[in-house]
Amino acid sequence: MEKILREKLVNGQFSNAPALRSKMMRALKGANTKSTEQKFQKALIDAGITYFQVNAKLIGNPDIFFPFYHVVVFLDGCFWHGCPKCGHVPKSNTSYWRTKIERNKERDIQKRLILHEQGYEIVEYWEHELKEDLSRCVKLLANIIEDNLIRISSYAV
């Protein structure tokens, strides 16, 4: 890392700082970290809620998919998906980030509408909701799954 920094130092300043910053950020590796998604998945398993898939090949790339119950779960990061409670636009390059986040929100709506039209129950959680009360989120999802099981069972009769 030090070698990279010295190479980019020109007259006491960094040349091409954004490219260097990007390269340095890619080099950072998390250690002993658990993502919000991993914590939620573990909480589901601990609650006895299994038979879900991650990385399902569905439109919109839901974070968790329950094929039998026709339930898809999106765990939206507050920054990337423009949370109305705690999402924010960075102070630098504001127009880029505002456009980017608005596009993300529009894409989310379009993809979820398609999933809804295909008969999926859509469950959405904001990152801050999971951090504030994970067990509540798990209980709500358990209730939705149970309701869908009853609905599916009534069609089978």
Regions found by a protein language model. Name each.
Residues 1-157:
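Nucleic-acid endo/exonuclease domains
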